[in-house]
């Protein structure tokens, strides 16, 4: 499987502060990829580097095998929607579409007009008077109408109400189904990612903690509940990601490639949210232990 975005030892510093450091990952082509992690993980910096809006301090990043924003042809292959869904407040919707057509050689005017009509935007209305959901739909339309091969979305629904989020994501998935666009979607809203993504990347402190097809990850992780015991007594090949214990019971979230046949365990499936929170908690606990060793 070819990688649409590939990074190795990637870092970005602002003076003496690292926003992203020693990040290595590969994001597959032809997928809707959910990128999730805590605040400060480096998600926004990574996506802005991939979009060519920032230059790395160290390491490498490639998009479609080339340096991001290496030229007009490369820029045309990538669409980007930032969290604040930037639009020009004084410009009418129609003027945004004309500007998009002027800037993008592969601009699809019919797609742009159709989407504007579908989401109910008045072409004469100024962008500054649109609601947050309407501005997000305008920004998505501008990104889609350039007909990119890769669409990068940095928390585009973070400030939207549930109905606006649903409409935005529905429009996104309709476009993906129609044009086969690769998508990288960053969000804290795991429930939204679970609805639309088929590939997951969990990023914590610039490190990829887990990555893979959502269906495969969910099938290989389970929640185990049973009489209290040492997790080290589990069969070989079972990796405990998260654990909690009471006086009488142990509850584990574990990764395994083989079925667990011990009848004393009650085994239940996990959700994407369970998975994300477990790996984020594990990364936090690992960091706490390292700090304790240093001190």
PLM regions and their residue ranges:
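The feature captures the beta-strand-to-loop junction immediately N-terminal to the Walker
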Residues: 36-38
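Helix-to-loop junction immediately C-terminal to a conserved catalytic motif
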Residues: 51
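Conserved ABC transporter NBD signature motif
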Residues: 58-74
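ABC-family P-loop ATPase nucleotide-binding domains
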Residues: 83-138
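Catalytic Walker B motif of ABC-type/P-loop ATPase nucleotide-binding domains
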Residues: 151-155, 160
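ABC transporter nucleotide-binding domain
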Residues: 166-254, 291
